[in-house]
């Protein structure tokens, strides 16, 4: 494969395609109304530069120093950034459709101001930014990006279900709307029970509420036996039985006496196992910080 000829950035005044820009430094450089297609920028420095109405279509930036650059109406559709420094950048009306970031120092707030309007593209960009934040050890930013991603997913799912525009009415019908409803319910339950893994305290609170709920059901509708004798169900006893059932510890001296009580115990035990999985996952996320 022939080696690409290296070019200098200032020499481009209108457009460039399939060009290689490498090992060049242009601080305070100003460029306007230029289109770059499938170009590669390697170790290019543009500190405090001003770029206005530029198009970077499917370009690759590797180890570039773009700190303090002011981007105005710059389109990065399909571009990839690897190990670049984009701290303190300012981005006004920029486009990041299908853009990807890996191991970059970023000004996340500026990029979030330029999220694509299409939900699927916005979610894709947020996933890439979140992976970048995890790679760089920015766990708090990664959690914030996850929350933003889930909010957009829920908004899009609601549109798929209710079809507020002709686009959604044409593309989501019958089974598709039902599947979207199930996805939305799953996200809502995940957020309610444990905040999508971001809020451990909510997990404990919801577990306590479930234990109390099942204790109330045992008190009014369930019956247990001990040594072949029916146990008088008061709330403290029901709360104890609910706790040992939810935590899957069990108690060898007590056993359900009716089919309905058996079903309640089995269902609560399943919920306890599910909650244990949630707890392990949430603690792992917390300790991995």
Residue ranges and their predicted role:
Residues 1-146, 153, 162:
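Tandem repeat scaffolds
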Residues 125, 177, 192, 196-200, ...:
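Hydrophobic, aromatic-rich alpha-helical transmembrane segments
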Residues 156-208:
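Cytosolic-side membrane-insertion boundary helix
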Residues 204, 208, 212, 271-278:
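Residue-level signal for the membrane-embedded core of alpha-helical transmembrane segments
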Residues 205-238, 260:
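Outer-pore turret/helix-boundary of cation channels
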Residues 230-289:
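Pore domain of cation channels
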């Amino acid at each position: 494969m022939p080696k690409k000829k290296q070019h200098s950035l200032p020499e481009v005044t209108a457009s460039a395609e399939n060009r290689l820009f490498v090992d060049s430094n242009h601080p305070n450089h100003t460029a306007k109304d230029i289109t770059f297609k499938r170009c590669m920028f390697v170790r290019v420095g543009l500190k405090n530069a001003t770029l206005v109405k530029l198009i970077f279509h499917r370009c690759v930036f590797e180890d570039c120093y773009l700190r303090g650059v002011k981007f105005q109406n710059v389109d990065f559709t399909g571009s990839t950034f690897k190990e670049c420094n984009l701290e303190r950048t300012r981005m006004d009306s920029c486009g990041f459709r299908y853009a990807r970031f890996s191991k970059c120092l970023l000004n996340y707030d500026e990029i979030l101001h330029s999220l694509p309007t299409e939900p699927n593209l916005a979610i894709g960009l947020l996933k890439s930014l979140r992976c970048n934040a995890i790679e760089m050890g920015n766990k708090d930013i990664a959690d914030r990006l996850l929350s933003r991603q889930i909010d957009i997913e829920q908004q899009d799912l609601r549109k798929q279900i209710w079809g507020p525009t002709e686009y959604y009415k044409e593309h989501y019908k019958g089974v598709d709307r039902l599947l979207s409803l199930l996805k939305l319910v799953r996200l809502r339950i995940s957020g309610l029970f444990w905040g999508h893994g971001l809020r451990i305290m909510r997990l404990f609170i919801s577990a306590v509420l479930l234990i109390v709920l099942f204790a109330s059901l045992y008190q009014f509708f369930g019956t247990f036996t001990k040594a072949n004798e029916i146990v008088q169900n008061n709330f403290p006893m029901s709360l104890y039985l609910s706790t040992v059932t939810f935590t899957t510890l069990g108690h060898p001296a007590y056993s359900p006496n009716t089919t309905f009580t058996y079903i309640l115990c089995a269902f609560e035990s399943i919920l306890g196992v599910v909650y244990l999985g949630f707890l392990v996952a949430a603690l792992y996320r917390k300790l991995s910080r």
